[in-house]
């Protein structure tokens, strides 16, 4: 009798643990890409968020300017693009201007 109660208790605890861990895993990533961050930091700021679910609306939890913050994401990557390129910048119009890193990419036509 005691062993059956113990078994029921253990099974119940296992089920509660599984259900609780599924709630934690349920954090989904919001659409969009974090903006490029080219800032070098001497010291990191305390995080304002840990996951996208900590942010309101469409904002994502991104590492930007020395700490994790809730920011508005840039557009989704276009097909063939690289995660490292900043898709929020427009493609250059002519070949004369100085282009920061990320401008020569698969999404901008070569001139």
From Swiss-Prot:
Task: Please give the superkingdom of this protein's source.
Answer: Eukaryota
Question: Which key words tag this protein in UniProt?
Answer: Antibiotic, Antimicrobial, Disulfide bond, Protease inhibitor, Secreted, Serine protease inhibitor, Signal
Q: Which SMART domains match?
A: WAP
Q: Which GO terms describe its molecular function?
A: serine-type endopeptidase inhibitor activity
From the UniProt annotation, give the residues forming the signal peptide.
1-23
GO BP term, example: defense response to bacterium
The protein's predominant localisation is secreted
Where's it found, cell-wise? Secreted
Q: What does this protein do?
A: Antibacterial protein. Putative acid-stable proteinase inhibitor.
Q: What is this protein called?
A: WAP four-disulfide core domain protein 12
Q: Which species is listed as the source?
A: Saimiri boliviensis boliviensis (Bolivian squirrel monkey)
